[in-house]
């Protein structure tokens, strides 16, 4: 599932997670 809380999407910000959104210091991973 995609998280749309922040953009851009599809950043691998959480090692191994393929669908993450980064917003400042916050990372949202599906």
Curated annotation (Swiss-Prot):
Tissue: Expressed by the venom gland.
Known role: Lethal neurotoxin. Causes spastic paralysis and death in mice in 4-6 minutes after intracerebroventricular injection at dose levels of 1.5 ug per mouse.
Predominant location: secreted
Keyword Secreted in record: yes
Cellular localisation: Secreted
Comment on protein domains: The presence of a 'disulfide through disulfide knot' structurally defines this protein as a knottin.
Domain of life: Eukaryota
Record-given protein name: U5-ctenitoxin-Pk1b
Keyword Secreted on entry: yes
């Amino acid at each position: 599932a995609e998280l749309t809380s922040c953009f851009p999407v599809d950043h691998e910000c959480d090692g191994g997670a393929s669908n993450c959104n980064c917003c400042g210091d916050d990372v949202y991973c599906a």
